Swiss-Prot record:
The lineage of its organism: Eukaryota, Amoebozoa, Evosea, Archamoebae, Mastigamoebida. Pfam families: WH2. This is Actobindin homolog. PROSITE patterns: WH2. Residues 35-52 form the WH2 domain. Keywords: Actin-binding, Repeat. GO terms for molecular function: actin binding. Is able to bind two actin monomers at high concentrations of G-actin. It comes from Entamoeba histolytica.
Length: 85
């Protein structure tokens, strides 16, 4: 709404100071740079993976003896048309 925003354009905002939170929270901690070449060589060597068992639950949960009833839509429409005449 233009009327509501008209007063905001002329408003003067107060100056505010923000705290620098980029420094580590834990004191006396050094962050070491990792050796990039060592990391890449480790990736290239590969790692033997453990065998994983999976539980495939993607199948629908419908009983095996479930039946789909016959579609009686045609008969219903015929009854409606017959009574409408």
């Amino acid at each position: 709404d233009a009327k509501a925003l008209a007063g905001i354009a002329d408003a003067k905002l107060k100056h505010t100071e923000t705290g620098d939170k980029s420094a580590p929270v834990i004191e006396n901690v050094e962050i070491k740079k990792g050796d990039r070449n060592e990391l890449l060589s480790g990736i290239k060597e590969g790692k033997e993976l453990k065998k994983a068992e999976t539980n495939d639950r993607s199948a629908p949960v419908i009983p095996a003896d479930a039946k789909v009833q016959e579609d009686n839509r045609g008969a219903l429409l015929a009854d409606i048309q017959a009574t409408a005449k």
